[in-house]
Amino acid sequence: MAEITREQVVDYLSNLPVIQIAELIKDLENKWGVKAAPAAVAVAAGPAAAAPAEKAPEQTEFDVVLANAGSNKIGVIKAIREITGLGLKEAKDLVEAAPKTVKEQVSKADAEEMKKKLVEAGATVELK
């Protein structure tokens, strides 16, 4: 039996009408007991394109951390009391112990609002 090259097979299949190729695929699936499915193609991307794919899911809960009370401690204490509902002594102790977590696991919107109030009072705030 003469050996047929891969190139000859490709040339032969290239000249067949699409209908005959579809029938050939069905015949091969039946003979081999497999199902033809589109192959997942892996595309090599450059580092710039890979960065978005590696991005972690967006964080939904944040800890509001008072990093530094700044020079207006009284204003920051008032803001802490408003945000947390703490008493005067507890709020003062929290402000003086900075860096300290003010609230844990709050939504992004609430965390941003708390940060805004504290920054307006003169504090340095981090969202973690």
Swiss-Prot record:
- UniProt GO MF annotations: mRNA binding; structural constituent of ribosome
The record's annotation in InterPro entries points to: Ribosomal_bL12 (IPR000206), Ribosomal_bL12_C (IPR013823), Ribosomal_bL12_C/ClpS-like (IPR014719), Ribosomal_bL12_oligo (IPR008932), Ribosomal_bL12_oligo_N_sf (IPR036235)
* Signal peptide span: none
Domain of life according to the entry: Bacteria
Q: Which GO terms describe its biological process?
A: translation
Record has Ribonucleoprotein as a keyword = yes
Q: Which NCBIfam families match?
A: L12
- Give the family this protein belongs to, as stated in its UniProt record: Belongs to the bacterial ribosomal protein bL12 family.
Its protein name is Large ribosomal subunit protein bL12
What is the scientific name of the source organism? Sorangium cellulosum (strain So ce56)
Q: Which gene encodes it?
A: rplL
